[in-house]
């Protein structure tokens, strides 16, 4: 391998601001910010808006969108085209 072409791989401290959770993960992400971690070492520090700790899909708090309203609205708009050949009751 050629020297000096690969990014530096190191431990980086990620902070999910929404869930107030910290992750210490190996990464090549560059940052000037640092923070002292629980183990007494100082690591590069990156803030996140969303991670697996706060995203609704991973936390199980994802809301299902009701399709009933969309189907009714479709029927109101285009139902006349489907009912042309049928007898009215």
Curated annotation (Swiss-Prot):
Recorded GO MF terms: structural constituent of ribosome
GO cellular component: ribonucleoprotein complex; ribosome
Keywords: Ribonucleoprotein, Ribosomal protein
GO biological process: translation
Superkingdom as given in the UniProt entry: Bacteria
InterPro entries: Ribosomal_bL28/bL31-like_sf, Ribosomal_bL31, Ribosomal_bL31_B, Ribosomal_bL31_sf
Keyword rRNA-binding appears in the UniProt entry: no
NCBIfam families: L31, PRK01678.1
Quaternary organization: Part of the 50S ribosomal subunit.
Protein family (similarity comment): Belongs to the bacterial ribosomal protein bL31 family. Type B subfamily.
PANTHER family: 50S RIBOSOMAL PROTEIN L31, CHLOROPLASTIC, LARGE RIBOSOMAL SUBUNIT PROTEIN BL31C
Name of protein: Large ribosomal subunit protein bL31B
The species this protein was found in: Aeromonas hydrophila subsp. hydrophila (strain ATCC 7966 / DSM 30187 / BCRC 13018 / CCUG 14551 / JCM 1027 / KCTC 2358 / NCIMB 9240 / NCTC 8049)
């Amino acid at each position: 391998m050629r020297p000096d072409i690969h990014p530096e791989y190191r431990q980086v401290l990620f902070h999910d601001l929404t869930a107030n959770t910290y992750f210490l993960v190996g990464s090549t992400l560059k940052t000037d910010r640092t923070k002292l971690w629980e183990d007494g070492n100082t690591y590069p520090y990156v803030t996140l808006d969303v991670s697996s700790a706060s995203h609704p899909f991973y936390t199980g708090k994802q809301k299902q969108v009701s399709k009933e309203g969309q189907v009714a609205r479709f029927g109101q708009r285009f139902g006349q085209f489907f009912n042309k050949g049928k007898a009215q009751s």
